Design a protein with these regions (language model features):
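Accessory alpha-helical/coil subdomains and C-terminal extensions
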Residues: 2-98
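C-terminal non-catalytic interaction/assembly regions of soluble proteins
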Residues: 60-213
Length: 213
């Protein structure tokens, strides 16, 4: 959503684990956007849950894997995307629906690395070596944000972070539960740095469709 410049730019819908996910409302949201724009780009977290807190994806997984802390492993699993794409096709009768499940793509593409993230990740490594070698301490390096955007690095005990999940604050999610808010963009903007890719637009209008099959 940070790269969007115009109201019609995608992603048009964003779904996060902090808001219970309802299939019926999802279809209603998609239909509203598709009827208005003729397209709909949706970003869905793999960790979205139903009203009971159960991850949606677990309903469609044959084998549920867990990490060492007991958390359900959902990264890179395409089941959720396939289910939602099929649901849209069936309910809205839209022929061209595609779901792309990102695994390591967004983590390894150097063309989209934030300069801020690069710098801070190096500094985290340096701090870790310092505490381990110079002070003979163990733990996890915590990045603590201060002011508009400054950071401090602190060493905290593993028990403060292991197996725990940091939740998205409610003020970062809109009332409908299907997108981010300006407050989230304000929070995220300093983290992206200055080298964010600009979105290009075609100046010409759409060409009328001539061939119908």
């Amino acid at each position: 959503g940070m790269a969007s410049k115009r109201p019609e730019d995608g992603p048009h819908l964003v779904y996060l684990p902090e808001t219970p996910f309802c299939m019926d409302k999802f279809i209603t949201d998609v239909k509203e956007v598709y009827d208005r724009l003729g397209r709909c780009v949706i970003a869905v977290s793999e960790g979205i849950v139903d009203e009971t807190g159960l991850p949606i994806v677990t309903k469609y997984m044959e084998n549920i894997e867990r990490d060492d802390h007991g958390n359900i492993s959902m990264s890179g699993n395409s089941a959720l995307g396939d289910v939602l794409a099929r649901l849209i096709k069936d309910k809205l009768k839209i022929k061209r629906v595609r779901a792309d499940t990102f695994g390591y793509i967004q983590r390894c593409f150097l063309g989209c690395v934030s300069e801020v993230d690069q710098q801070e990740s190096r500094e985290v490594g340096e701090k870790a070596v310092h505490f381990a070698v110079a002070e003979n301490k163990s733990g996890s390096i915590c990045i603590k944000r201060t002011g508009d955007y400054l950071v401090d690095y602190e060493l905290i005990d593993f028990c403060c972070v292991a197996a725990l999940t940091k939740k998205m604050p409610s003020q970062f999610i809109n009332e409908e539960g299907n997108n981010i808010t300006p407050a989230f963009k304000d929070y995220l903007r300093p983290l992206l740095g200055r080298n964010i890719t600009e979105v290009a637009y075609l100046s010409s209008g759409k060409i009328p469709k001539i061939i119908n099959k």
